[in-house]
């Protein structure tokens, strides 16, 4: 089984270093179109309503776990209702406190990003400064400290982190293409230095969104960065699994499919579950496709109490699905995981609905 051979290869490559440092608990690998954790297929043996769940990676977009705002003109927007001020360390601590609960419901992966995502859910402009990547491509130590706490906890829990590097609302914080590439290299080097084996790399969030400033982050050239991550990590004997994502309803392009290890789709704007099914089918027909995992790691459509919804449609098509929950206009603090400040508890009917369905599908009961 490729899962096991990949696991053995990675452990062999790092055995000398691991002898001197704590060994990581969680290793993610891929066996054709299936995910494995520690050499075993995820949700091993699970069948739900006649549909195989084994090998899927059910996930949730949680990019605000490491959020901060370096813009003094906007930071006050994120004040907590109780303290009337923003606190990035409190935010990360409260996130980590909830991770065991999510895992018990069957959540195996979370999506993070070194440049976050809109703290409003959707935004026309994004003046806040939420980036672990500095203008010259170096990395912010305070941001990395928060990120390490989250990835460490995921490792302890047997969870995977889908780590995005760039986001279209913040990539302008990096001055030029050389700095963009430096940011990629520094992120890869940091992951390897930390000995992380539970991380999947997402080069950038929604490469086809026109807001990107740097050409190398756009669809025609983003494969260059995927190849860069793979080449650099292999050279350092710590191969990383890499891809990028596309905006809602978009099918990956051949240049990405040919070089990616897995494929990331988004369901935002996809109102009919049958379109989710079509997206998976069409993705499997793209030039360069071979058996490889297909994941939705962002979808803001719910209807979790209905017999059919985007999540169920993805699972039936044998694609993993990712929950994206933001605070809709007029909603309060208890709603959403994307909107800052975040109540990371299962504090709304929407959140409860997702975790109920997730538990049912995966067979994992809290």
Language-model features and meaning:
Residues 5-16:
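Bacterial N-terminal signal peptides
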Residues 26, 33-37, 41-89, 287, ...:
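Extended substrate-binding grooves/exosites of carbohydrate-active enzymes
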Residues 36, 40-42, 47-260, 266:
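Active-site mouth of glycoside hydrolases
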Residues 183, 199-200, 204-352:
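Extracellular glycoside hydrolase catalytic/binding regions
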Residues 20-27:
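Cleaved targeting-peptide boundary
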Residues 9, 29-30, 144:
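Generic hydrophobic-segment detector
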